Amino acid sequence: MITGEEINQCITDNYPELIDKIYPIFTTVVNDLSVVYSITTVSGGYVGQDILQLRIFDSDYDVATEWKRKLINLFSTEKENKAIVLPTVSFTGALSGGGDNFRDDLQIWEITAIFVLKTKERV
């Protein structure tokens, strides 16, 4: 099972410009880029599976879709056939879905990417 802290660490280690722009479940920041994550555990144990949903919010569609591309490249590991190794967990990931939505109430784009992560606890 992967935690939000590990997702945050993985993203900020690779993209330090996202430090303080990553939030669990929701964000109240609508005047700047923000990335919101949610994790659903499908199966647990020593080897498990999680669904990671990333939502990128920005008023500029091109900026949001560029960040989506970067995060897809980070979490879709099947192309290189390698795992991402963190101190307490390692995982492989595959893009499972996503989409684009314009939030008319906030005048901001919400770009979503959904990943299936196969996790293994590190002892």
Region roles according to the model:
Residues I56-D62:
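A generic structural motif
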Residues I11, W67-N73:
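Short amphipathic alpha-helices in soluble, non-transmembrane regions
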Residues M1-Y46, D62, E78-V89:
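Small/polar-rich, solvent-exposed N-terminal microdomains that initiate assembly or binding
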Residues D50-I56:
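Short, well-ordered beta-strand segments in beta-rich or mixed alpha/beta enzyme
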Residues S34-V35, L52, A113:
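A broad, low-specificity signal marking well-ordered, structured residues that form hydrophobic/aromatic
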Residues M1-Q9, T40-Q49, V89-V123:
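Short, charged interaction patches at domain edges and termini
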